[in-house]
């Protein structure tokens, strides 16, 4: 353990907080500083050139990461009839209507994503106080309220991540695990950044992607030189 601690400490000492590193070097430093015994997530923080206080500049959406997230996701779906059967065939873990709503009200939230067909929102809408604070409330902006529930299930299982800008104008997202190779992490980061650019508010002026930093679950943030992302 002492050797591991010394290695991690040495790697942390290499990081200059104000320096912007080429993406390959940044990922190497992040992995080198990952000291937890579990497979830490690799996270990204993107500072956007927006005014998060303005309602027309709230950036929100979702993207399917090409290399996945490295996490097994349980999906619950509110649907009935043919759509319910399609959701089950697509791999949904829980499918229901009033019965599923009762499970939620009872505190049985054994799922990571909730998807709803538009015609079920009369039921789902009553669960806002439970699902909302947990980030589970279905929303058309992130593709979780949709007529095509089967495709939404497939997206969730394939590694779809949702993003929403915080009050400081920063997007936080996970782009993989420490065990991922750099190519997988870079492809996921590129997909996320592309989705963010597509979600740029029309009223946003100036530089949009201002700063990008990567980190591990228990590690420090490393700033990324944006020019290296297109190299």
From Swiss-Prot:
Q: Which SUPFAM superfamilies match?
A: Ribosomal protein L1
Q: Which UniProt keywords apply?
A: Repressor, Ribonucleoprotein, Ribosomal protein, RNA-binding, rRNA-binding, Translation regulation, tRNA-binding
Pfam families assigned to the protein according to its UniProt record, in alphabetical order: Ribosomal_L1
The family database entries (InterPro entries) matched by this protein are listed as:
Ribosom_uL1_bac-type (IPR005878), Ribosomal_uL1 (IPR002143), Ribosomal_uL1-like (IPR023674), Ribosomal_uL1/biogenesis (IPR028364), Ribosomal_uL1_3-a/b-sand (IPR016095), Ribosomal_uL1_CS (IPR023673)
Instruction: Give GO BP annotations, semicolon-separated.
Output: regulation of translation; translation
**Disulfide cross-links:** none
Q: Which GO terms describe its molecular function?
A: rRNA binding; structural constituent of ribosome; tRNA binding
Biological role stated in the UniProt entry: Binds directly to 23S rRNA. The L1 stalk is quite mobile in the ribosome, and is involved in E site tRNA release. Protein L1 is also a translational repressor protein, it controls the translation of the L11 operon by binding to its mRNA.
**Entry similarity comment:** Belongs to the universal ribosomal protein uL1 family.
Q: How does it assemble?
A: Part of the 50S ribosomal subunit.
Record's protein name: Large ribosomal subunit protein uL1
Organism (species):
Cupriavidus necator (strain ATCC 17699 / DSM 428 / KCTC 22496 / NCIMB 10442 / H16 / Stanier 337)
